UniProtKB/Swiss-Prot annotation:
Main localization (coarse): secreted
Disulfide bridge partners, by residue number: 109-131, 302-360, 306-362
Swiss-Prot/TrEMBL GO biological process terms: cellular response to amino acid stimulus; cellular response to hydrogen peroxide; cellular response to platelet-derived growth factor stimulus; cellular response to transforming growth factor beta stimulus; positive regulation of cell division; positive regulation of fibroblast proliferation; positive regulation of glomerular mesangial cell proliferation; positive regulation of monocyte extravasation
Protein name: Platelet-derived growth factor D
Species in which this protein is naturally found: Mus musculus (Mouse)
CDD domains: CUB (cd00041), PDGF (cd00135)
Amino acid sequence: MQRLVLVSILLCANFSCYPDTFATPQRASIKALRNANLRRDESNHLTDLYQREENIQVTSNGHVQSPRFPNSYPRNLLLTWWLRSQEKTRIQLSFDHQFGLEEAENDICRYDFVEVEEVSESSTVVRGRWCGHKEIPPRITSRTNQIKITFKSDDYFVAKPGFKIYYSFVEDFQPEAASETNWESVTSSFSGVSYHSPSITDPTLTADALDKTVAEFDTVEDLLKHFNPVSWQDDLENLYLDTPHYRGRSYHDRKSKVDLDRLNDDVKRYSCTPRNHSVNLREELKLTNAVFFPRCLLVQRCGGNCGCGTVNWKSCTCSSGKTVKKYHEVLKFEPGHFKRRGKAKNMALVDIQLDHHERCDCICSSRPPR
């Protein structure tokens, strides 16, 4: 009996006495349980895991959040929210700009994290797991009408402010002839917090469609302006912020900002160019009754893929725009008997002509050669 009273007091201290701790009141059912084996660490803190599941029927806008948000959340939590909306609808999530959990270890969220999973009858897909303070998680629109949100904290360090996730449902309807790149910015507001989202009537931008869009731009600035006409300058600055949670080794080793525009221009400038190519002399000269030394020579021939990523680049071929013939001196052998003494009549130094490409052009089916 004393243990039950103790557990009740602890639950009130950590959760129940904080209004709006978990979710906005909608149709919901809650299941909570605490491990029966209570343990304490050296500081006399409870170290067992408190688990709680909540089922939420998404019929309007609402939110879920870490306990005590925007203050430090408690330790030893495993909280789960199951969000379900009506059939033929989807669920959209947007994180509050105040976001902070315990930092990752070796770029992996091992200890404190929030995770979003998309659930269907046949599979469960993890849409993301986040921790740390560097970046706010992106907005998420589900592909099904069911989402699972999990928050876990361990028995060591805690952080603040935790997290707050705003949710709403969107109609799962797509116009028949909608353009894949037709994005429209709309604003939704929950409790005074606004964010931008794609129009709910537009289809999700596929990777192929996105690739075609990226190929139309020559600079990062123009590309970001296309996607975010209002916030593109902030997006450009954020590209070069030090965010080690998401950066690879090459980011930390370099001394200056990477010039993405120059890299893109180099691809278009140098992809279709003359380059060293080895040719077999017998095959190149189409001679079957002679052998040469050396057997192969280096020549300049056009090669490349006509600027990977440019519009219609897959329909283009890299061909010679200017070809010249150059002489090469080689040793030629002809079949027959070789004398061990005296001058061999079937062996001599000869000059041969080979084609060299001095200029290369991209020949595309959609336009004539230049």
